[in-house]
Amino acid sequence: MTTSINSVVTVFQNVFTNHGSTLLNGILIATTVGGQSLVRKLTFSCPCAYPLNIYHSLVFMFGPTAALLLIGITVNSTTWKLAHGFFFRVRDTRHSWKTTCVSWIEVLIQSSVAPIAWLFVVFLDGGYYRCYRSHEFCLISDAILCKNSTILNSYASTSSFNKISDNGKYCPPCICVPNPTDASYLEAESQIYAWGLLLFSGVAAFLVITCNRMCDKYTLVQRQYVETYKNVETQKFDAVAKEHASQLAEHNARAFFGQKDWTKRDWDWVSGIPEVNNPLFARLRLIAAEKTQQTMYTPLQLWNDNKGYRIPQPDLQLTQIIVDETKED
């Protein structure tokens, strides 16, 4: 039984390792489609007013598009690898303009999946686009609803009639309930745009991926090995970092609690919050290198340094690394 469970887990791990981005995009698209349907049913209602119908439709069409794009950029790890510490990188480690531009393009492309899915579903639905253009088919002289004097007078008697009809040019009730023939025409046009967007996005994605892989200096098998190495390296780095941080934190904590008693000053030291503008806990300064060879990250470390305690470095069982001493720092 245990063997079967392990086999299933292994299969899922392999699937996510090899096709993780594809599965993630699929889940993202499905979530976007479901979210659009929910928004359409619960919140969207075309207003019987011009030009409010235009603004209302555009907000629902492109507002979530911009939000999804921004969220995609925010959650992309490459964004923060490029941005984090940008102004304080050592000159030799700064990314070249070529690398920066290519990386940002990749981030934008990866973040465009959900926005494009949203636009596709929005145009395929047709309701938003119909509302956006319905006033074009609702001239007050032609609209059937406004030929009914009772309906027209009920709108004309309101103080906002001139605002919602562009001074009597459009028929307000027709904007939110257009003629069925006109509504069908607008919905069909919207769906054409939807499939055109999908076709264009698919072709563009295929061409970009193809060109990128054709220009890759690695073969497919070698690229798979490189990606495997990157993943394993990240896992190992995190594991060793946790071990190192755990030992260092334990040494600092034992130094603090190894005292017989503590003054209020001691507790004030370890209760601080690192702030950029605070000279005591300045992140940018990181306790200048001339004071200590060990970078300080937390108030507890600062307290130990202020006390003059020498905290031993973590003793990690690492494979011996041969350093080329002919290279200058």
Swiss-Prot record:
Keywords: Calcium, Calcium channel, Calcium transport, Cell membrane, Glycoprotein, Ion channel, Ion transport, Membrane, Transmembrane, Transmembrane helix, Transport, Voltage-gated channel
Residue intervals annotated with topology Cytoplasmic: 1-14, 75-103, 213-329
Record-linked InterPro entries: CALHM
Effect of gene knockout: Uncoordinated locomotion with mutants showing reduced forward velocity, muscle force and power production.
Domain of life: Eukaryota
Residues annotated as transmembrane: 15-35, 54-74, 104-124, 192-212
GO molecular function, one term: monoatomic cation channel activity
Sites where a glycan is attached: N148
Pfam family, one: Ca_hom_mod
Tissue spec. comment: Expressed in head and body wall muscles, IL2, ASG, ASI, ASJ, PHA and PHB sensory neurons, and spermatheca.
Signal peptide interval: none
GO cellular component terms given for this protein: monoatomic ion channel complex; non-motile cilium; plasma membrane
Compartments, record wording: Cell membrane
Entry's family note: Belongs to the CALHM family.
Name of the featured protein: Calcium homeostasis modulator protein
Gene: clhm-1
